[in-house]
Amino acid sequence: MSHNTFGHLFRVTTWGESHGPSIGAVVDGCPAGIPLTETDLQPFLDLRRPGTSRHVTPRQEPDQVRILSGTFEDDRTDGPVTTGAPISLMIENTDQRSKDYSAIRDKWRPGHADYTYDMKYGIRDYRGGGRSSARETAMRVAAGGIARKVLGDGISIRAALVQVGDRAIDRSRWDWDEVSNNPFFCPDATTAALWEADMDALRRAGSSTGAIVEVVVSGVPVGWGAPVYAKLDSELAAAMMTINAVKGVEIGAGFGSAAMRGEDAADEMRMGEDGPVFLSNHNGGVLGGISTGQDLVVRFAVKPTSSITVERNTLDRNFEETVIETRGRHDPCVGIRAVPVGEAMAALVLADQKLRHAGQSAY
């Protein structure tokens, strides 16, 4: 199985399976001299951690990350700092319940990677999905914490859930402070309360639903990215598409641009006191694959969780028709915990872009 590494100069390789003894990552290309401890990474992992509300999987994992290499401390440093060597990260799995999957070991869950993994590799770890499980994203979040350190305090990466099922937020009520006040990372308190009832009904029905996550990055200077095949927006889109269950990505106005007229979609410019000023941001902070200095705006759609208790038709490994219902502990809406993962993927792309920009910029 190849392609477990993400990035160019700032690279992250993840390893491990949902029900294995541990999961981990190796971060390569991190500059030396950056202060780094586990406490810098843990807050981001706590946001993604399972078992935090009744609206996510009840699997109880503390997700305590350990830094095994790549940092050093002595009397000349103010705490551990990165050395430039690969940084190894590890999280132990402590609450596996593999017996929950014995009934589906030879059946393919509709909408899941079971079928394609079997067809490609001839073998799959059916316990929680193995490598295809969203459990792997914990290591992306940990690595994303390191990427944020590389980016520095001048760049802010925030994300929110803006739609669950067919119920979207009211953008006139958007409040970033509200995101940390509810279990959905929702910027609209009124809609978050409605989602509570929606999710309770879904859980009782044994079903699931999809969602849309919006990521907003502030502070990226003009000039990051490259034309043609290394466009900043194409790399952000590709990064979001690597997240489990993501089926669509848009930048700025995205698909809504198709309904606009040219004079409306183009972001007009004026000269301000400190330089050029854009009058709108329909292009999501990127033109020609290069950042404009405006906010980067990315949205991605997450399909409903495939593991549900509703009985469905499928095939087994002998290509015999059968029915399946998936027991175990699953997210009724995987989009909720995808919010911190979306932030992490944006951080990984931008840390890589920062290092690449340093070698290509005219300024």
UniProtKB/Swiss-Prot annotation:
Gene Ontology BP term (one): chorismate biosynthetic process
Reaction catalysis annotation: 5-O-(1-carboxyvinyl)-3-phosphoshikimate = chorismate + phosphate
Documented EC number(s): 4.2.3.5
Cofactor remark: Reduced FMN (FMNH(2)).
Enzyme superclass (EC): lyase
Residues bound to FMN: 131-133, 244-245, 288, 303-307, 329
GO molecular function: chorismate synthase activity; FMN binding
InterPro entries associated with the record: Chorismate_synth, Chorismate_synth_AroC_sf, Chorismate_synthase_CS
Pathway the protein takes part in: Metabolic intermediate biosynthesis; chorismate biosynthesis; chorismate from D-erythrose 4-phosphate and phosphoenolpyruvate: step 7/7
Cofactor(s) needed: FMNH2
Superkingdom of source: Bacteria
Gene Ontology cellular component annotations, sorted alphabetically: cytosol
Residues where NADP(+) binds: 48, 54
Keywords of the record: Amino-acid biosynthesis, Aromatic amino acid biosynthesis, FAD, Flavoprotein, FMN, Lyase, NADP
Protein function: This reaction introduces a second double bond into the aromatic ring system.
Subunit details: Homotetramer.
Family according to the record: Belongs to the chorismate synthase family.
Protein's name according to its UniProt entry: Chorismate synthase
Organism: Maricaulis maris (strain MCS10) (Caulobacter maris)
